[in-house]
């Protein structure tokens, strides 16, 4: 009889835990919950996902960079890097050690038209 009680106690100590579920199932459930929580903030971060509009403290007030969208900034940076890597534009070194790089490029027409409208509107508002 005493042997039966000890074997029953062992069974109880190795028995499933937490509402009758085995430990490995609970671990899997916990893993799934953690995984879903990692994915949920993506929807919650939609507000944060929109990048903050950058400011250009060193740029003049009438600098076009103040009016560029994220896409236009990206296009400009890509164009500048491509031009530099392919040898377009003019790169020079002054006697004081300053490096200068100057290049001209075109954005797609839709972006150019939008920028012309935005800059002409802000220029006319500044004149008033």
UniProtKB/Swiss-Prot annotation:
- Origin, by domain of life? Viruses
Q: Does the keyword Ribonucleoprotein apply?
A: yes
Pfam families this protein is in? Arteri_nucleo
**Localization per record:** Virion
Q: Major location, coarse class?
A: virion
By its UniProt entry, which Gene3D superfamilies does this protein fall under? 6.10.140.90
MF terms per GO, please? RNA binding
Keywords on this record?
A: Ribonucleoprotein, RNA-binding, Viral nucleoprotein, Virion
Q: Where is this region: Disordered?
A: 1-60
SUPFAM superfamilies per UniProt: Nucleocapsid protein dimerization domain
Q: What are its GO cellular component terms?
A: ribonucleoprotein complex; viral nucleocapsid
Family from the record: Belongs to the arteriviridae nucleocapsid family.
Give the protein name, as stated in the record. Nucleoprotein
Origin organism is Porcine reproductive and respiratory syndrome virus (isolate Pig/United States/SD 01-08/2001)
For this protein's source organism, the top of the classification is: Viruses, Riboviria, Orthornavirae, Pisuviricota, Pisoniviricetes
- Per the record, the gene is N
